[in-house]
């Protein structure tokens, strides 16, 4: 068995490292894109299983390397919660990103508009794909998935746009959601 002194010492060290990581400077990070997402995880608190919402920010450096910048438990994905996370990143020296990838949560989009108005925003293709399938009958999932993948992996922006129009035309006729 592990003694409570060992647990206390270990917790103090982990807490100290966690606090240092959460307050580290981001001024020298060559971050050009951000991926922002809220996720729900199941945890045990006071011997009871419960769900908590985590706000996660991943930075993408100029060389394509991904860096975890923030993971915060804020009680949900409200505009205020996301604004607090974004303000903290800016306070730590994060420069204005060139591009944002988001999950589509309304609170996040409002917080972004308040902090980085004008930065291009793209809906995460994984979230969009899940949303499409959630609104379609299961018998169409494979075909919709194949068409969607074909569209998002097109080689040029012109090809993407042509495939997007084709996707919309086909699926508006085949399945009105």
Locate predicted features:
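DNA-recognition alpha helix
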Residues: 1
């Amino acid at each position: 068995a592990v003694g409570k002194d060992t647990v206390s010492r270990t917790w103090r060290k982990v807490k100290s490292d966690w606090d240092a990581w959460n307050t580290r400077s981001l001024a020298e990070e060559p971050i050009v894109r951000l991926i922002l997402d809220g996720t729900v995880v199941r945890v045990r608190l006071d011997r009871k299983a419960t769900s908590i919402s985590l706000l996660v920010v991943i930075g993408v450096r100029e060389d394509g390397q991904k860096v975890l910048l923030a993971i915060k438990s804020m009680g949900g994905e409200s505009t205020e919660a996301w604004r607090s996370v974004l303000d903290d990143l800016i306070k730590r020296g994060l420069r204005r990103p060139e591009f944002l990838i988001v999950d589509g949560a309304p609170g996040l989009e409002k917080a972004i508009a308040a902090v980085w108005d004008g930065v291009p925003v793209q809906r995460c293709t994984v979230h969009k794909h899940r949303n499409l399938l959630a609104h379609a009958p299961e018998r169409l999932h494979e075909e919709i998935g194949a068409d969607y993948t074909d569209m998002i992996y097109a080689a040029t922006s012109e090809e993407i746009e042509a495939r997007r129009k084709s996707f919309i035309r086909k699926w508006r006729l085949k399945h009105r959601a």
